[in-house]
């Protein structure tokens, strides 16, 4: 309303690493819960970090940071590896505001903890998805989306596309104490966790010919899950895809060939993150609209793409063009309420060599 910006340092002891960004959850009383982690961490500097405001809407009222390690000796013994990366909290009104927080913790796998007191205390962790034969170097990547009422939708991969030559995409959702496939059949209850990727719904089965995949976003369109992901026929060919589950099957639509990775590979070096695409995200209020980052004249630019009738073609509208710097990782915040403006955010990279070596700004633009 005023154009003024207010800032608050939540925790001053993180490493320089772009994985260490927070997720925010609006609590039932209007306060905001922030949760985040180091990138893996090490004893003494690892675990999940959280802050909560004491005055709704006032970021200056964030509490001091609380650091905790969601672990049990039994779980660590069974799944061997202990590290803490990512924190993704969601609240379900149908379960009296119960909070579910997911992250990559014990076993290097997606874990789940639950709170029934707005984040003051948490349950013991459970591993959600694991490899059929435990591999502590295998790490499924997950994206989440919740309706805020009863469901938490998940898309995930076998692992990292740098490691998995046929990295595929899977889907499931949580509801009423259990995890379910897209067709509504049950995978398992929370108490029966973990399950394997093959137990969930297959969104995209990768082959050497069609290319391994990585995931970028998930929302719902009239209750149907819609997914944004990338296929890599080769590491220098990044193809953006849209998929929707409708009438019992997944329908896939190619959006664009987006270019290659965005890290600025230095001379006489081998790129470490060849699957770092510019990125794409849904406008969750209109899932037929996405915002993408793609290469134009060797610069990464942001565009708005809208699915045309029939779903096979896309209308592309520029957001940035002729930029001095690369523009990557667009994102439209979820859960906008009536009267709130819709905002597109993205990273502007003056330099991005690696996720530990970058000089970036977060830019934003109001969108319809």
Predicted regions and their residues:
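Extracellular, repeat-based ectodomains that mediate carbohydrate processing or recognition
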Residues: 1-368
């Amino acid at each position: 309303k005023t154009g003024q910006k207010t800032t608050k340092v939540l925790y001053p002891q993180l490493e320089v690493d772009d994985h260490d960004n927070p997720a925010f959850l609006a609590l039932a009383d209007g306060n905001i819960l922030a949760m985040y982690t180091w990138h893996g961490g090490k004893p003494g500097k690892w675990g999940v970090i959280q802050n909560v405001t004491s005055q709704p809407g006032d970021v200056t009222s964030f509490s001091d940071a609380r650091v905790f390690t969601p672990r049990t000796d039994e779980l660590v013994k069974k799944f061997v590896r202990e590290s803490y990366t990512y924190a993704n909290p969601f609240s379900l009104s149908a379960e009296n505001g119960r909070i579910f927080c997911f992250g990559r913790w014990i076993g290097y796998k997606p874990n789940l903890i639950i709170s029934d007191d707005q984040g003051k205390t948490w349950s013991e962790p459970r591993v959600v998805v694991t490899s059929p034969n435990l591999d502590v170097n295998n790490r499924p990547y997950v994206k989440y989306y919740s309706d805020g009422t009863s469901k938490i939708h998940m898309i995930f991969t076998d692992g990292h596309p740098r490691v998995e030559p046929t990295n595929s995409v899977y889907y499931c959702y949580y509801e009423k104490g259990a995890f379910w496939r897209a067709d509504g059949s049950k995978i398992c209850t929370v108490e029966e966790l973990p399950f394997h990727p093959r137990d969930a719904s297959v969104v995209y089965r990768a082959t050497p010919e069609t290319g391994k995949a990585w995931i970028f976003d998930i929302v719902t369109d009239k209750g149907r899950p819609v997914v944004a992901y990338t296929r890599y026929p080769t590491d220098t060919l990044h193809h953006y895809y849209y998929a929707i589950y409708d009438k019992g099957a997944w329908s896939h639509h190619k959006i664009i060939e987006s270019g290659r990775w965005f890290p600025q590979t230095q001379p006489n070096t081998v790129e470490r993150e060849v699957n770092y695409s510019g990125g794409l995200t849904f406008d969750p209020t209109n899932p037929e609209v996405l915002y993408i980052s793609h290469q134009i004249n060797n610069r990464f630019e942001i565009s708005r793409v809208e699915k045309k009738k029939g779903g096979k073609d896309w209308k592309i509208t520029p957001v940035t063009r002729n930029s001095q710097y690369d523009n990557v990782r667009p994102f439209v915040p979820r859960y906008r309420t009536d009267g709130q403006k819709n905002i597109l955010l993205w990273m502007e990279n003056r330099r991005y060599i690696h996720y530990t070596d970058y000089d970036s700004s977060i830019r934003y633009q109001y969108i319809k």
